């Protein structure tokens, strides 16, 4: 049997850090996602690959320009190297795999030298092909690294020279967090700018006494003017090759927490400039410039009027404040110039003076000097004028400067395309990738397997579905339309105020879920009518007429945690109030039927007990909004505000935070657990779905029950716990007062906490996986004879087992018991597929063989929390392909295709 796998879909948000995103000339964008790098194509709106290597959060990424012509031809790319830095104190050099796809990279070198988190890196390429890199760190140092140019041996063997640390600059007690490198205009002498937790920008220049091979830098000056910490620095050379007699000038853009952007111009100090500005040289290389302007602006303390002079190779240069850009209302985290590009017709290098800044005021601004006056103006402003987002952390231009890509506080991306078809150009929002920005704890396919929902400690439930549309390409043969299918987030059923831990679908009901978080109550939600219609438009999922009357949409009040149902003007909710009020204003118990009392009967708010009807919550009226039925995946703003599911019930009873929840296959019972440190707390509560009431409280454990699993026939309930044992309960007769009775507990069935349990498709076996690196498979027929109940123990794994999941039934795998497939996830991100055969020595036992291990290049990097098989595999001739969806503490959700030949 030949088994292979590939990744079909990756969803992960960007790290919540400033400037953690880059877009290269090779058309690939790279961003930090937990402890790995994600490479994606913004135009296709798809994450192509992830690069594992770091042990902690990735803080900054930088593409390395490829100036070697042979390498350019070999890789057909301007960039085929990448540098990244992390909170694990290291810098990693990445290189594109020879002969691989343009998004397949490997680790070339791990640079160690810093003693604390590395916060920023910048790189400069010399004409001879050598490289200079600057790294800043929380250890209060800045390190300079050098790499020699490629040799013939490097090119022949497809290797790279080693990086060497050539200088360490100590800034104790200050910490530098950003840097930028450039050449002094008209020379190949490097200039370094660093900034950090102080209002100064420190400028360093190469010590001309040092050799080219042992570059050493000396401090030139400190630029003053900002009133708060420096957040981002970026150099740009202008006037390069633009007409005869034009002198090169260098502009340094700096952004700060003082809400301002400053542009510093570095150019040769000519006699003409001296005559025009009448510079009066005075100490520290400074000069009192623009005296008249200073007098006029005496009340503006943030405008520096000082010019800075320095000598380089007997040539005098001056640094002048060129402009102060004021347009943001909060910290400016990121500043980037538009990239240089080649004119397709003339081949000339075009470097537009265009700048983009990203701020915590939720906007990104495109700045450009006015063509007539030369004054810098905010040409365009993109972002969110309201809503729930908390600001932009970074923004970059595409290689052609026709697109803007930004990332925000909640890990979300925002993508705009410039539309120049109109008289005045404007930026249109585009569909872009999305994902969690915190550990993903749970996920599950919908009962019909048309979509899945993931649950994260970033306090959101996210719903992903296939976007099915036709490719209207006129070049297709016979003009037949080809269907394109991609996975996208189309709804966000819950945005909570607590970290979400678990959820489950209610089987036999359409679009109904129950979630649990770090609070003592659970909440039930129903898909809105807008969601049902949107799912039909985007995924072609036909609605099921189950008699459920759905609210049009949901809205979350400003100070509430409940998703309030939203109806049209003539809703049943309003009619219910009117009918009850008209019924003699009496409820039959001598109490007046006021509007308030009816609202409380329909569910109440967060303060009271849950009723049996629709839980509207009693809050002040919200600002009206217009829910939309969409025909394509929504933007982040819509997901945040208009894709919530209405809350229909709250479950009260648990004394601590909810940990696990599960629903029986027949949809009759719901089981839930909470954090526990004693037997009284470690109970499993059973709820009757028909009336949402608690009907049993099952005992059997002494510590937290971390996972619950019903058998496919709904007859058994399996619980696994921190107390290192599992417990099995059996469904009672329908006329019994107790719906479930305990069958057996297995003390010390594992040596460490048991994280997961799963039933085989025929319910004859169940598997348990634990931190003791073992997976055990138990035979239900022998379950009461605990000594002989273990049908098999898989070989010890390399790390703790965090989840196990049996595959659904397939005709391809048959045997006396029906051969089984089992997926196992570990706490290092590894996923393996195992196949069973009936043991020849014991018919009631199973022998297991590992048939496939998903490649680390596409797999997770941290704990795998859930693995879910899609119900129906795809059969093509003799091959069979399953889909599994997985989630991890590494913030990512992935879909893998597992192909059996």
Curated annotation (Swiss-Prot):
According to the record, the residues making up region (Disordered) are 571-598
User: Which Gene Ontology cellular component terms are annotated?
Assistant: cytoplasm; elongator holoenzyme complex; nucleus
Biased composition of type Low complexity is found at 574-591
Q: Which Gene3D superfamilies match?
A: YVTN repeat-like/Quinoprotein amine dehydrogenase (2.130.10.10)
Record-linked InterPro entries = Elp2 (IPR037289), WD40/YVTN_repeat-like_dom_sf (IPR015943), WD40_repeat_dom_sf (IPR036322), WD40_rpt (IPR001680)
Q: Which SUPFAM superfamilies match?
A: WD40 repeat-like
- The keyword Plastid appears for this protein: no
Q: Where in the cell is it found?
A: Cytoplasm; Nucleus
WD repeat ranges?
A: 11-50, 53-104, 113-155, 173-214, 225-274, 327-377, 387-426, 435-474, 495-535, 653-697, 700-739, 749-788, 796-844, 859-897
What biological process terms from GO does the record include? regulation of transcription by RNA polymerase II; tRNA wobble uridine modification
- Is RNA-binding tagged as a keyword? no
Superkingdom field: Eukaryota
| SMART domains found in the cross-reference section | WD40
According to the UniProt entry, the note on domains is:
Folds into a two seven-bladed beta-propeller structure which is required for elongator complex assembly.
The entry's family comment says: Belongs to the WD repeat ELP2 family.
Biological role stated in the UniProt entry: Component of the elongator complex which is required for multiple tRNA modifications, including mcm5U (5-methoxycarbonylmethyl uridine), mcm5s2U (5-methoxycarbonylmethyl-2-thiouridine), and ncm5U (5-carbamoylmethyl uridine). The elongator complex catalyzes formation of carboxymethyluridine in the wobble base at position 34 in tRNAs.
Q: Could you describe the subunit structure of this protein? A: Component of the elongator complex.
What name goes with this protein?
Answer: Elongator complex protein 2
According to its UniProt entry, this protein's organism is Dictyostelium discoideum (Social amoeba)
